[in-house]
Amino acid sequence: MKNVILTLDTETADLSGNVYDLGYIIHDKDGNQLTSYNALVSEIFTQPKIMMGAFYAKKLFSHYAPMLDNSEITMRPWQEIIDQLRADIVEFNVTTIAAYNIGFDMRAMSNTHKSLTGESRVLQSKIKVLDIWQFACEAKLRSLPKGLSEVRLNERSY
């Protein structure tokens, strides 16, 4: 079976979830892009009280407004975004979802989904997940000279 990866990124308005920007690229293991998607969550992005707490609040007008004007990003209801995500997973036979800190992204998506729909499951079936951050750390440790990785790990233990 061909390995097809959906590399995901979310931006949240706060630590409890409230995803306001969800984007992904679907590609093969060699990086050949099959499709991409990026949307602002209308239920969150249009709420000033929520959005002022966002890490990137200063970029709302300098970053997102021009993207909306240039049709580089769309604003959609959460359910429509999730429906598109699910449809793309099926259409492109996605085998793995990857993100830099996938635990955060999946938790934020789950919290947002539950808050906006009352449902607890974002994805409809089990799928492999890859934490790019963890993968990079493990790859770096494997590249160290034999024995050095253990020494460095022991130096940092407390």
Language-model features, listed with the residues they occupy:
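Active-site-proximal helix-loop-helix substrate-binding element of RNase H-like nuclease domains
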Residues: 43-68, 132-158
